Amino acid sequence: MCLLRLPVTLLVLCVALNELKATSIASDTGHQVGKRKCNTATCATQRLTNFLVRSSHNLGAALLPTDVGSNTYGKRNAPQISDRELLHYLPL
């Protein structure tokens, strides 16, 4: 019976410490929303574009920076409707 007390005590202590850590982190952050992380390739492309735009000012070409990332607007894929699907909806 004594052999079971130590693992049970350690398990209870471990659960209590994990609960304590979880409550302290949750109370520190409050209701803040974290910024979404972007794709590595997207971030690298944006940094390279911004660097090239800044360096081009020294050469005389003034290009506008290109916004690339998850928060930018761009062309969206529209659903394609074929002619056969349109004919199905027409009354005969």
Curated annotation (Swiss-Prot):
Disulfide bonds join 38-43. Keywords: Amidation, Amyloid, Cleavage on pair of basic residues, Disulfide bond, Hormone, Secreted, Signal. It comes from the Eukaryota. Residues 1-22 form the signal peptide. The modification Tyrosine amide is found at residue 73. It is found in: Secreted. Residues 23-34, 77-92 form a propeptide. One of its GO terms (molecular function) is hormone activity. Its main location: secreted. The keyword Secreted applies. GO terms for biological process: amylin receptor 1 signaling pathway; amylin receptor 2 signaling pathway; amylin receptor 3 signaling pathway; amylin receptor signaling pathway; bone resorption; negative regulation of bone resorption; negative regulation of osteoclast differentiation; osteoclast differentiation. Gene3D superfamilies: 6.10.250.2190. GO terms for cellular component: extracellular space; neuronal cell body. SMART domains: CALCITONIN. InterPro entries: Calcitonin-like (IPR021117), Calcitonin/adrenomedullin (IPR021116), Calcitonin_CS (IPR018360), Calcitonin_peptide-like (IPR001693), IAPP (IPR000443). Belongs to the calcitonin family. The mature protein is largely unstructured in the absence of a cognate ligand. Amylin/IAPP is a glucoregulatory peptide hormone that plays an important role in the regulation of energy homeostasis. Selectively inhibits insulin-stimulated glucose utilization and glycogen deposition in muscle, while not affecting adipocyte glucose metabolism. IAPP function is mediated by the CALCR-RAMPs (AMYRs) receptor complexes. Amylin can also bind CALCR receptor in the absence of RAMPs, although it is more selective for AMYRs. Can form homodimers. Interacts with IDE and INS. Interaction with INS inhibits homodimerization and fibril formation. This is Islet amyloid polypeptide. It comes from Cavia porcellus.
